[in-house]
């Protein structure tokens, strides 16, 4: 029951934020679109990814996203939180945006390629390179597969 109420509250908050953004004249809009994201990644184990991001468009065909967040995991009998910075470069191809991405944690660097639906739902694949193994933790390296949902809070249609 609490989860339903929380979900309903979040949905109402998103719709009210989006509708308020539509009421502003074009000149008042910020060129950055920002919001939270949540996702799943497999890279030597399962990770829940939560972050905040900002996206801007230097022109009509390219988009760049910067994000910072945390990866949550339960491995080897304990919960682990790993901070992460990411940079994504999207090419606008109408509905499906191909992208390249780089993610950096204190332990790995992970280049990725993938496709995104309107830069809202991202599907990526890449390879993680472990450069500093965390103490009492297994190396986080190898093939990685991820899916993420980016929730724009100040998106405008025009």
Task: Tell what function each PLM region has.
Residues 21-59, 65:
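Short glycine/proline- and aromatic-enriched beta-strand/turn motifs that initiate or cap beta-hairpins
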Residues 1-26:
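Bacterial Sec-dependent N-terminal signal peptides
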Residues 57-61, 92-95, 118-122, 152-154:
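Outer-membrane beta-barrel channels and translocator barrels
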Residues 32-42, 62-74, 93-107, 122-131:
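Transmembrane beta-strand segments that form the barrel wall of outer-membrane beta-barrel proteins
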Residues 47, 82, 97, 108, ...:
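Transmembrane beta-barrel architecture of outer-membrane proteins
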Residues 140-158:
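Outer-membrane beta-barrel "beta-signal"
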Residues 36-40, 50-54, 70, 85-89, ...:
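Residues on the lipid-exposed face of transmembrane beta-strands in outer-membrane beta-barrel proteins
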């Amino acid at each position: 029951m609490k989860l339903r109420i929380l979900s309903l509250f979040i949905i109402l908050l998103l719709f009210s934020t989006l509708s308020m953004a539509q009421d502003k004249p074009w000149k008042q809009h910020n060129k950055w679109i920002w919001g939270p994201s949540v996702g799943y990644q497999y890279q030597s184990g399962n990770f829940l990814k939560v972050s905040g991001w900002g996206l801007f468009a230097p022109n009509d065909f390219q988009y760049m996203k910067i994000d910072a967040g945390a990866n949550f995991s339960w491995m080897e009998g304990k919960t682990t939180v790993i901070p992460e910075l990411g940079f994504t470069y999207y090419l606008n191809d109408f509905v499906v945006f191909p992208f390249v991405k780089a993610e950096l944690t204190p332990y790995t660097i992970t280049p990725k390629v993938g496709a995104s639906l309107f830069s809202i739902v991202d599907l990526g694949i890449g390879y993680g390179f472990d450069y500093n193994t965390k103490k009492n933790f297994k190396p986080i390296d190898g093939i990685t597969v991820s899916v993420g949902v980016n929730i724009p809070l100040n998106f405008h249609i025009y």
